[in-house]
């Protein structure tokens, strides 16, 4: 993937940097693998806003992604590389030898015509899915299961990968993209390689409208609100916070306050927290 940098022809192109999409080989998705995608836009079942700054955006159709990779022993051929509006990684359409078609996350350097395989004993090639205990130390992996047979849950964003640091008994030590070091069961599956689109973090919208197309609404500072709307609000002109520390709109400590539960069960598997 490559990034196109725009000159300031108009205010909308100033500071714009967008994907070129030169790696895509197909523009229309596979009809059997798409579904309607009803988005809640930050509302709960009562219509109350529970997550702010969401709403609008372009209509999307959801692509069914195979995160489990449970076609064990059945070889698949990469038929096309496609765009997915629901994630910043590219997806690959796989044609299996038994006739089934599935979408997977495209690993970096996996191209049309390449062959992939899942299951124990598969070759150590990019795009193949194996149990963690069969993947060598130092390998880059993605789409990692946390619970066996549940499907990949972590390391799925564009350009991300985890690294295998050690193997000890029933657990494998991984270093995640967040620098967190975590233990995972050796029976869990993972895919070899790095997720495609490693330049996704370089994209800059250049204008507010492009961000609205993604379904993101504006964020208003608490200091410009009224005191009935935010703890930072009120005062004459540009007033200081007036509190000992920054607070959320609901009066909870903000900016640096750790929000993870102190006695969460998964703490036993985290050797070092993310930095």
Curated annotation (Swiss-Prot):
Translocase listed as a keyword: no
Record-level Gene Ontology MF annotations: rRNA binding; structural constituent of ribosome; transferase activity
Localization, UniProt: Plastid, Chloroplast
A single BP term in Gene Ontology: mitochondrial translation
Domain of life: Eukaryota
One GO cellular component, as annotated: mitochondrial large ribosomal subunit
Statement: the UniProt record of this protein carries the keyword ATP-binding: no
Keyword annotations of the record: Chloroplast, Plastid, Ribonucleoprotein, Ribosomal protein
Region Disordered, annotated ranges: 219-254
HAMAP family: Ribosomal_uL2_B (MF_01320_B)
Family: Belongs to the universal ribosomal protein uL2 family.
Assembly description: Part of the 50S ribosomal subunit.
Name the record gives this protein: Large ribosomal subunit protein uL2c
């Amino acid at each position: 993937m490559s990034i196109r940098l725009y000159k300031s022809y108009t205010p909308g192109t100033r500071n714009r940097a967008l994907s070129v999409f030169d790696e895509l080989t197909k523009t229309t998705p596979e009809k059997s693998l798409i579904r309607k995608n009803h988005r809640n836009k930050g509302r709960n079942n009562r219509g109350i806003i529970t997550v702010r700054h969401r709403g609008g955006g372009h209509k999307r159709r959801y692509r069914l992604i195979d995160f489990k990779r449970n076609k064990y022993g059945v070889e698949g051929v990469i038929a096309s590389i496609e765009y997915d509006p629901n994630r910043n990684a590219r997806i690959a359409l796989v044609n299996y030898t038994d006739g089934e078609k599935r979408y997977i996350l495209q690993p970096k350097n996996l191209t049309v015509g390449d062959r992939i395989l899942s299951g124990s004993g598969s070759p150590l090639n990019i795009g193949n899915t194996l149990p963690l205990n069969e993947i060598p130390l130092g390998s880059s992996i993605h789409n990692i299961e946390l619970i066996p047979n549940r499907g990949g849950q972590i390391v799925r964003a564009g350009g991300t990968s985890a690294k295998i640091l050690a193997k000890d008994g029933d657990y494998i030590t991984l270093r995640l993209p967040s620098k967190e070091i975590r233990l995972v069961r050796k029976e869990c599956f993972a895919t070899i390689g790095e997720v495609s689109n490693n330049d996704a973090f370089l994209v800059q919208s250049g204008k507010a409208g492009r961000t609205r197309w993604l379904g993101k609404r504006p964020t208003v500072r608490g200091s410009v609100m009224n005191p009935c709307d935010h703890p930072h609000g009120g005062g004459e002109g540009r007033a200081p916070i007036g509190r000992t520390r920054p607070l959320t709109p609901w009066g909870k400590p903000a900016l640096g306050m750790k929000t993870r539960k102190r006695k969460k069960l998964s703490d036993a598997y985290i050797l070092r927290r993310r930095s």
